Amino acid sequence: MKAISSRTIVLASLVGFAVGGKIYTLNECVRGEGFYDSFNFENITDPTHGRVTYVNRTTAESLNLTYATSDTFILRADDTTVLGVNDTGRNSVRIRSNRWYHEHVVVFDIQHMPEGCGTWPAIWETKESDWPASGEIDILEGANNVVPNQSTLHTSHNCSMSNHTHQTGTFLTTNCDASVAYNVGCGVQHTRDNNSFGPGFNRIGGGWYAMERTLHYIKVWFWERDDPCVPLDVRTGAWIIDTEHWGIPAANFRNSTECDIRSHFGANNIIIDLTFCGDWAGNPAIYNASGCPLDCVTYVNNNPSAFTNAYFQISSMTVYE
């Protein structure tokens, strides 16, 4: 499908502000072909050692791995090619925002996310050239269709979270230090909602992910498409939002004597990608526990049709500051 239109709205006349870390104004709204203007395609070797080849924009468009309508952006992987043992990996896409972000709120309206054994989709923030010193925030991430979603921080030394925090999710680990335990980070599972990831997410038509980063905390919310509790300012993409009325977040990473958010997070980009296997999805213990067949690389190499549903369909990304 040929990309036919775009709309990127940057509200330069609105100077973003926050009152008490709760009230924000719209700074950027990205839809459709606007993703081409707001993001770079990263034609790089996968730092997570996935069975993937990240292609540039020209290749992505020619292979139909990205395309857009007036209100939708698609990012997907190849689903036709059987890979040989000497091939570098399945063609896919990794995009990085042109802008850097400090304190902000970002909201993603997502209709569909990649699913399938061997898949490892993610929407996250980091500064690649200064990782982990500038921190990493994984907003949406998972592997091999295993539910629910997991939101995770990865940092430099001396950052741990308290288990006693006001959130609906459950901490799997509390030490965010990337040098500890093979970089598992401090992860929170969205245990209240198995539709927050994978096939269940897609069956309900997706929903909204939001992340708020301040000097004192980082919060992540998820609302299903038909959730009556979706805040009106989220559902409508309002010019002004008030996170105070968004309810209890799924993940709530807070300042403490064990971690100073300000000193562990710098100016970061937003990254959206889809890899296969690699350090997480391809870990034999994790892959086998997910109930997926064969080993990860063999499966990904030989079953291209299994990845027909391995795509992001994103309606919009809105940023508030």
Regions inferred by a protein language model and the residue ranges of each:
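Cleavable N-terminal signal peptides of Sec/SRP-targeted secreted and luminal proteins
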Residues: A3-G20
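GH16 jelly-roll
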Residues: A3, G21-E321
